[in-house]
Amino acid sequence: MKKQLRKEFLTQRNNIGKRREKDQRICEFINAIIEKYERIMIDYPISSEPNILSIIENSKKKFYLPYCNKNNIEPRYLENVNDLIKDDVNIYSSKIKTNDELEVVIAPAVACNKQFYRLGYGGGFYDRFLENKDIIKIVVVYDELLTNINFHESFDISFDYIVTEKEVLKRM
């Protein structure tokens, strides 16, 4: 079921227009949520994902990018967005290894349901990384990809916030 949903939602996401305005609105919502936190992992956007990199501009916060190796995510400190490498799954990350304790993780998604579960790309990286972590978990999707479909499985991790360009949903 997830494989077919992923395909349908990716097609839908690829056809979304006015991305720049939507991305800007998403960033405004995220900035309000992360205001009191200092160590935040964000995702370098691929394909048609929302681009939230503008939240790092002029910020005094510490940002990190996920480095995906084999089956795991390793947070890497982001010192300079112009000095990146590609990880094992060909996504941009940082070279700088760190043991810093993250406070917030902002994850991408193909889609998200209103039960606060994300539909990722099928690798389980974020589910394994976030398992048993006491951390603020934010998933970012365009509003068109927020669904009522109950697709989560027992190993899926639920998120604390869903951020779209139209609203912020907080899990109670």
Regions found by a protein language model. Name each.
Residues 28, 40, 63, 79, ...:
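Short, flexible coil/linker segments at or flanking structured domains
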Residues 50, 82, 93-95, 123, ...:
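Solvent-exposed, flexible loop/coil residues
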